[in-house]
């Protein structure tokens, strides 16, 4: 625990919260040359306990040097990071110790947390997602309590002075790059004190920390061999990874359609034509083919216009069977030339010119099975923030919330792992689709994307929702939106749902997908 000029009551409470723990521990305190007599008094009293060791720096060195001093002195197999004015829950170390005993190969562990004010009132519980490496790149979500295998913390170089202010984020990025197992304890075991001027109370309180975090993420990308640039997100302490995709990579876009028209923003449009127009006009990735799988009722003038727009980049595939969205997607995949596939509903419109780069590039990274985008309704509200499966609900995170809503703990602003993705905009590879057997044709209209997502996740692959990649989805203007009970029962009988979604445990509004 690094200490510097801590208010007496807060320091005493922090130390007491450790001393009351029932598990075996040592508390290593490093005082960074505090001048306060109260700090010296509290530490002198604390070190009377044989479980407490206090080191005193002669010269103030800052949080990174102080933390490294503490790490160098640690005797335990694991180190837990505690700020000098925060609190551990009474059962904290006992729960941590039990978890470490259950999984001997744990190298990094984190818990849920809340905030506590000067009056001792607890609020703002952060029920965190399970291990989400993409979210960690975009947000230091694991926070407190973080428990790291001591040997690994030292092996990666400890705390980096270049990351002053975001040194924990930098360290956790380095540790998790090598960790054999990362475990989340879904229990509030840490209380983050919110005082004026602290990041707990105001995320913009330390702008230098945001910049340090941005640089830490960039170094992480370089170590991981991820071709891209870390940029600032929409709010302080959020980041975006802008990935690079080799222009030579061919992408096949598969669009099932019946060729209908609909009113959008007061004007009637041919939906599939305007989607293709937006792709060809806006996409900055040019090596594409567009496979349109159409039913016989599709008007000939629509087919003619698609051919005129796309020329050799358009492939029209006739589908003569009864309506089956899943079958049409599978037919489109078989007709496509590329290894990398992007499935789009015909009632979409591109907003982000780099949508193909940002959806396809992650598929080259180990363990990524599919990606999806941020989808908006015509009125700008959020339509898709990833799938959430919990307690019998099959939902879209953030469905219908304002488009500028940051979501619970900024979940709608940062890219992250999720339990599933809508097939309205889903990127994957031919290899993955063949591995899982494609779309389930027993589900012709609804929940086929839920089934596909569960199959992909069942192969141990991750699904990423890419927050900075946006398209409009004029949902169901081209088909009957009705959900049949038998469809729901089919997918529930096959897969069920957990009680709590591992990637989105709180803050969603239950709505059928």
Predicted regions and their residues:
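Short aromatic/hydrophobic "clamp" motif used to bind/position activated sugar donors
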Residues: 79, 341
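A recurrent flexible, glycine/aromatic-enriched loop bordering the glycosyltransferase active site
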Residues: 64, 72, 123-147, 151, ...
């Amino acid at each position: 625990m690094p200490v510097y000029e801590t208010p007496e009551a807060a320091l005493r409470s922090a130390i007491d919260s450790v001393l009351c723990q029932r598990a075996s521990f040592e508390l290593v305190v490093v005082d960074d040359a505090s001048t306060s007599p109260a700090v010296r008094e509290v530490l002198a009293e604390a070190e009377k306990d044989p479980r407490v060791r206090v080191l005193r720096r002669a010269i103030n060195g800052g949080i990174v040097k102080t933390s490294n001093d503490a790490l160098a002195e640690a005797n335990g197999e694991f180190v837990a990071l505690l700020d000098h004015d925060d609190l551990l829950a009474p059962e904290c170390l006992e729960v941590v110790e039990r978890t470490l005993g259950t999984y001997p190969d744990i190298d990094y562990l984190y818990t849920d947390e809340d905030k506590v004010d000067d009056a001792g009132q607890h609020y703002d519980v952060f029920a965190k997602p399970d291990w989400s490496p993409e979210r960690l790149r975009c947000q230091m979500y694991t926070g407190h309590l973080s428990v790291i295998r001591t040997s690994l913390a030292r092996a990666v170089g400890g705390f980096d002075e270049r990351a002053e202010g975001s040194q924990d984020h930098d360290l956790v990025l380095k540790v998790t790059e090598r960790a054999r197992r990362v475990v989340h304890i879904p229990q509030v075991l840490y209380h983050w004190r919110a005082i004026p001027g602290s990041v707990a109370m105001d995320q913009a309180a330390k702008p230098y920390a945001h910049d340090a975090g941005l640089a830490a993420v960039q170094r992480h990308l370089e170590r991981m061999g991820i071709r891209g640039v870390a940029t600032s997100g929409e709010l302080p302490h959020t980041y975006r990874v802008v990935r690079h995709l080799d222009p030579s990579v061919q992408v096949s876009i598969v669009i099932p359609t019946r060729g209908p028209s609909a009113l959008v923003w007061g004007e009637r449009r041919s939906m599939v034509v305007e989607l293709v127009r937006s792709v060809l006009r806006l996409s900055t990735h040019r090596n594409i083919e567009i496979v349109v799988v159409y039913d016989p009722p599709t008007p000939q003038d629509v087919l003619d216009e698609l051919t005129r727009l796309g020329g050799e980049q358009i492939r029209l595939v006739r589908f003569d069977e009864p309506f089956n969205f899943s079958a049409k997607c599978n037919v489109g995949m078989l007709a496509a030339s590329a290894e990398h596939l992007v499935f789009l509903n015909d009632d979409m419109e591109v907003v982000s010119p780099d949508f193909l780069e940002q959806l396809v590039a992650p598929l080259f990274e180990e363990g990524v099975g599919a990606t999806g985008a941020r989808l908006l309704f015509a009125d700008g509200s959020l339509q898709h923030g990833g799938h959430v499966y919990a307690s019998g609900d099959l939902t879209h995170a953030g469905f219908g919330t304002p488009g500028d809503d940051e979501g619970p703990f900024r979940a709608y602003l940062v890219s992250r792992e999720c339990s599933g993705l809508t097939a309205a905009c889903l990127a994957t590879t031919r290899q993955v689709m063949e591995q899982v057997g494609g779309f389930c044709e027993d589900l012709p209209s609804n929940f086929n994307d839920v089934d596909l997502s569960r199959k992909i996740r069942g192969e141990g692959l991750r699904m990423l929702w890419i927050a900075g990649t946006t398209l409009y989805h004029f949902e169901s203007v081209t088909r009957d939106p009705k959900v049949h009970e038998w469809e729901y029962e089919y997918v529930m009988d096959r897969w069920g749902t957990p009680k709590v979604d591992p990637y989105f445990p709180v803050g969603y509004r239950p709505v059928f997908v």
